[in-house]
Amino acid sequence: MVTLCGSTRFKEQFLEAQKRLTLEGNIVISVGLFGHSGDEEVWTEGTKEMLDNMHKRKIDMADSIYVINVGGYIGESTRSEIEYATRNGKEVEYLEPLKKD
């Protein structure tokens, strides 16, 4: 079981990864809303915090996370999810190879 993580601005890449990982035989858990792609509900008071907490529960259920890091972009929320997953012994995979600093 794998949970997708990343900026919701990358909706198409989320959907592509979900399809590919599913066809590879994985159970895929994704985001519920794409806030950067027009889901206005995300920006109401308290909703983003609720969704962030809920996404950590999705990470708890998974064996690994798959980070949608288009162009190497990893935002603050995604970085927090990666740290959370790592602390909890989850494997972390990336759509694009990490850039060396």
Language-model segments: residues:
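Conserved catalytic or regulatory cores that recognize and/or transform ribose-phosphate-containing ligands
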Residues: 1-101
